[in-house]
Amino acid sequence: MTEPLSTRPVLLQLHHVSVAGANRAPRLSNISLSMQAGERLALIGPNGSGKSTLLRVLTSELGTTTGYIHLNGQPLNSLSRHERAKRIAILAQNDTPDLRLRVAEYVALGRIPHHGFSTPANDRQLIEEALDDTGLLPLRHRLLGTLSGGERQRAALARAFAQTPQLLLLDEPTNHLDPLARAQLLSLVRKRGISTLAVLHDLPLITPFADRVAVLQQGTLLRWGTPAHALSADCVKSVFGMESFTVSHPINGSPIRIFEAPELH
């Protein structure tokens, strides 16, 4: 039986976090939210709302102007770069791996923060598990350059799994993937049970994937809660300019959210 979110320990906590951009204009303003261990949190909002900025803060690529961030009870800014690499993995949009690497070699890069370029027996087992969990064992000897876009994204996810982080960050991981590959990728993350903060644009994928949703607009946290709360019709209309409604699945009766863009005139 899955433990309820409310009883799990807090993994990530942001308290009144702000980030200033050019001319001191706020890129993030007074963001406070938390994630429980094992939670999947979807971060959504229109372009320019601060989603990628928040990820860059969590990877310490950007510093905060005010506020603090704790990861597993420790101040994030107290951790060395090496220690952060052990604890936080990111699947970035602009990942450009060496396409001459074989899949298993690429996945093994996830162990570097822990043991450098040596590969002890336990690391080899973790790499095998990551390949297996992502369905890549049959492709382990293939060159990255010969993979499809979906297969290459799964390889990047396997590398992140092999890193065994406390927190997985996904920056629009389903971009450029076909519908089946999108659903499969998020399903792999869900089955792994890893604490995940994912920037997502594909609204229909959010409810099946996320435990909670944080909605950003113009650098502020507009709404934070369950998918039903965060993706209410009024919020979707206000933030994305789209209509939304709920229908029942024709086979199992579960609720399905439908999002509809207004016609252009």
Task: List each language-model region with its residue ranges.
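Conserved ABC ATPase signature
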Residues: L143-L147, E151
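ABC ATPase nucleotide-binding domains
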Residues: A233, K237-H265
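Helix-to-loop junction immediately C-terminal to a conserved catalytic motif
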Residues: T59
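Catalytic Walker B motif of ABC-type/P-loop ATPase nucleotide-binding domains
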Residues: L168-E172, L177
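Conserved ABC ATPase "signature" region
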Residues: A108, N122-L139
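The feature captures the beta-strand-to-loop junction immediately N-terminal to the Walker
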Residues: I44-P46
